[in-house]
Curated annotation (Swiss-Prot):
It comes from Pisum sativum (Garden pea). It is an enzyme of class 6 (ligase). This is Glutamine synthetase root isozyme B. GO terms for biological process: glutamine biosynthetic process. GO terms for molecular function: ATP binding; glutamine synthetase activity. Its EC number is 6.3.1.2. SUPFAM superfamilies: Glutamine synthetase, N-terminal domain (SSF54368), Glutamine synthetase/guanido kinase (SSF55931). Gene3D superfamilies: Glutamine synthetase, N-terminal domain, Glutamine synthetase/guanido kinase, catalytic domain. Residues 19-99 form the GS beta-grasp domain. Belongs to the glutamine synthetase family. The gene is GS3B. The lineage of its organism: Eukaryota, Viridiplantae, Streptophyta, Embryophyta, Tracheophyta. It is found in: Cytoplasm.
């Protein structure tokens, strides 16, 4: 008799051409991820060839019970690292039956910005550093921390190794490999300053694909922690006190910034970001005021600043960029729970499209 693990790992391609497509979308809170699966007659590689679908929006805080149907529009396809074979993960955005985007559909406006000819011509690149915290199930306390107590002070945990410094590496490594299998442009991982906190990086990714890849990577991480009986938190300051928060630093460049003379373009872009600081902060994640205190490698939330190699500034420029006279900059303000569609498109809009009045 087959064991459960045998059935979970069963290769469908040996017996049928049919595949399983897991449709994934963002729920009513703007950070919760939902998904459900359907059978398709055969392999699909183009999201435009996937059928639209629907779900009960009243159960995700996205529609009233008397008119609960919400429509899923497939937008991006990734290989399914859990079912494998020809099975796929499908990133969707959400609409009313009349075709209007829901308020939680941040992809819709982002796609409009990225399709603007001036933005498309600049080929915007993003590298997102997604930090997160692993929590012990049921007690809302970081993995590896003594229950009701605290580990030793910060210092040995950043990029640390050893059973007394790195908690949850098996989850992190499984996630890394699963993202590579899925076709996500994940570029690295590392342990963070607070024990139980980790980071993965996605990019360089062009335009709207950065948001699609971050949401797909978050979904895969949620699934792996589900299997492991661990909870993943994207709270920007999960533990109060003298502990680092969790961010989602956004590294950004345009074609003009990557070419000779690009450093001057970067400085003009940073000036624009400073003029719209309040608007960006308002869109960069809930609870970010608990993280952006001017301590723990952050800038004060109320003060815009930038500097070369300064991790205490709002915007950091790397020394290589300064030396080469071209490159990229890092926006250190986004919280770990930010919507990547909002952050990436807003940076492009401000630096490329927005004009000072």
């Amino acid at each position: 008799m087959s064991s459960l693990s045998d059935l979970i790992n069963f290769n469908l391609s040996d017996s049928t051409e049919k595949i399983i497509a897991e449709y994934i979308w963002v729920g009513g809170s703007g950070i919760d991820i939902r998904s459900k699966a359907r059978t398709l007659p055969g392999p699909v590689s183009d999201p435009a060839k996937l059928p639209k679908w629907n779900y009960d929006g009243s159960s995700t805080d996205q529609a009233p019970g008397k008119d609960s149907e919400v429509i899923l529009y497939p937008q991006a396809i990734f290989k399914d690292p859990f079912r494998r074979g020809n099975n796929i993960l499908v990133i969707c955005d959400v609409y009313t039956p009349a075709g209007e985007p829901l308020p939680t559909n941040k992809r819709y406006n982002a796609a409009k910005i990225f399709s603007h000819p001036d933005v498309a011509a600049e080929v915007p690149w993003y590298g997102i550093e997604q930090e997160y915290t692993l929590l012990q199930k049921d007690i809302n306390w970081p993995l590896g921390w003594p229950i009701g107590g605290y580990p030793g002070k910060q210092g040995p945990y950043y990029c640390g190794i050893g059973a007394d410094k790195a908690y949850g590496r098996d989850i992190v490594d499984a996630h890394y490999k699963a993202c590579l299998f899925a076709g996500i442009n994940i570029s690295g991982i590392n342990g963070e300053v607070m024990p139980g906190q980790w980071e993965f990086q996605v990019g360089p990714s062009v335009g709207i694909s950065a948001g699609d890849e971050i949401w797909a990577a978050r979904y895969i991480l949620e699934r792996i922690t589900e299997i492991s009986g661990v909870v993943v938190s994207f709270d920007p300051k999960p533990i109060p006190g003298d502990w680092n928060g969790a961010g989602a630093h956004a590294n950004f460049s345009t074609k003009s910034m990557r070419e000779n003379g690009g450093y001057e373009v970067i400085k003009k872009a940073i000036e624009k970001l400073g003029l719209r600081h309040k608007e960006h902060i308002a869109a960069y994640g809930e609870g970010n005021e608990r993280r952006l205190t001017g301590k723990h490698e952050t800038a004060d939330i109320n003060v815009f600043s930038w500097g070369v190699a300064n991790r205490g500034s709002s915007i950091r420029v790397g020394r290589d960029t300064e030396k080469d006279g071209k490159g990229y900059f890092e926006d250190r303000r986004p919280a770990s729970n930010m919507d990547p569609y909002v952050v990436t498109s807003m940076i492009a809009e401000t630096t490329i499209l927005w004009k000072k009045s």
